[in-house]
C-alpha cells in the first residue's frame, strides 16, 4: 500500500498558482523497476505541444505511452497493484476528501510515459472528465530537475516548476485556472513518468 501510505504521511499542499499537493515516495522500488523495464520504440516523432501528438489527427506519440490494462496487468504486476490501490475505497475516499471531488462511479487510468528530447506541452487545463490528475516522476537517468511540470498563472506566465526528482510527484483536480504544461527544455535521454487519473469515462478499472 505504498501509494496510500504516501498520501497519508508524505503529502504537502500549495495553492500557488492553484491548489495542488506534492507527494513523496509514492512508488516502491519494484514499481520503479517496472516503469523502466518497458521498452519504448526508437525513431523519429513529431512533437506538437500535445501529450498524444495528435494536433494533426495522427496520434504521433502513441507509441511513447503505455496504458496498464488487462492485457499487460500480469506482466506489470507492481503497476497493476497500484491500479488496485487506486480502486480501493480507502484510496478513493482519501483522495475524494483531499480534492473535494466525488470519485464514486469513476474509473482508474494509469499510463507510463517516455518523453524524449524535443517534447514540450503547451499550457492547458485538463478536460472536465479528468477528476484527478497526478504525475509521478522517476529519474534514474540523472536528468535535470527543471524537467518537472510547469505551472502557470492565468496570464500563462510560468509561476513555478515542480522538480523532476525521483519518486516524487503531484496531485490536483482541474479548476478554471489550473494551467500546466512543459516548456521546451533539454532532455538528455528520457523523461519517464507515471500518470495517474480518476476519470468519468469508462476504462477497464472501475473504482470499488
Write out the residue ranges for each language-model feature.
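Catalytic core of non-heme Fe(II) oxygenases with the double-stranded beta-helix
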Residues: 75-87, 91-208
Amino acid at each position: 500500500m505504498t501509494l496510500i501510505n504516501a498520501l497519508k504521511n508524505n503529502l504537502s499542499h500549495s495553492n500557488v498558482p492553484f491548489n495542488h499537493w506534492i507527494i513523496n515516495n509514492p512508488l516502491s522500488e519494484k514499481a520503479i523497476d517496472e516503469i523502466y523495464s518497458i521498452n519504448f520504440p526508437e525513431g523519429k516523432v513529431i512533437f506538437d505541444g500535445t501529450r498524444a501528438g495528435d494536433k494533426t489527427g495522427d496520434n504521433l506519440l502513441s507509441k511513447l505511452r503505455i496504458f496498464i490494462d488487462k492485457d499487460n496487468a500480469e506482466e506489470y504486476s507492481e503497476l497493476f497493484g497500484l491500479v488496485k490501490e487506486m480502486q480501493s475505497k480507502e484510496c478513493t475516499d482519501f483522495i475524494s476528501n483531499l480534492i473535494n471531488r466525488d470519485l464514486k462511479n469513476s474509473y482508474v487510468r494509469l499510463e507510463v510515459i517516455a518523453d524524449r528530447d524535443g517534447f514540450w506541452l503547451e499550457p492547458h487545463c485538463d478536460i472536465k472528465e479528468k477528476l484527478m490528475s497526478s504525475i509521478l516522476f522517476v529519474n534514474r537517468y540523472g536528468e535535470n530537475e527543471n524537467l518537472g511540470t510547469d505551472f502557470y498563472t492565468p496570464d500563462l506566465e510560468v509561476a513555478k516548476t515542480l522538480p523532476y526528482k525521483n519518486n516524487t510527484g503531484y496531485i490536483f483536480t482541474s479548476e478554471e485556472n489550473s494551467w500546466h504544461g512543459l516548456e521546451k527544455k533539454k532532455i538528455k535521454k528520457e523523461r519517464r513518468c507515471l500518470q495517474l487519473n480518476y476519470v468519468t469515462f469508462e476504462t477497464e478499472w472501475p473504482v470499488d
